[in-house]
Amino acid sequence: MKYLIASNKNWHKELSKSLQIKTAYQFDIINDETELTLERLESISPQIIFFTHWSNTIPKEIFTKYECIIFHMTDLPFGRGGSPLQNLIIRGHKDTKLSALKCSEEYDAGPIYLKEKLSLAGTAEEILFRASKLMESMIIKILLEK
């Protein structure tokens, strides 16, 4: 089985490699929105596309053809929309939940697969590192339930 990680962040290349080792599944990665095309996806043929850190709109023709799972750094439906980490920190939150949800036409409004607690202690880099590790365990849980 093939899966795809879509992330604007280079550190998710390591996430892709780690998941491949831990699950024995093939994980490809897309780091740029120009690569997220139907033609490219058809050549990869992923079972699921995991959007671990994606700041761009996902085209409808992609999320209707492929199972697309988005990770969002709030306890949805609270905090829907852009810049969730920054908004939580500005508002003084000490922790949040990382939500894994199905991509839908309305932003951050699809059915939720699962949520896990995420501490907001430390620098943004430390928080994002913890979130990446948490995403890894959440992806494994999602795959085990399939």
Regions found by a protein language model. Name each.
Residues M1-K146:
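One-carbon transfer enzymes
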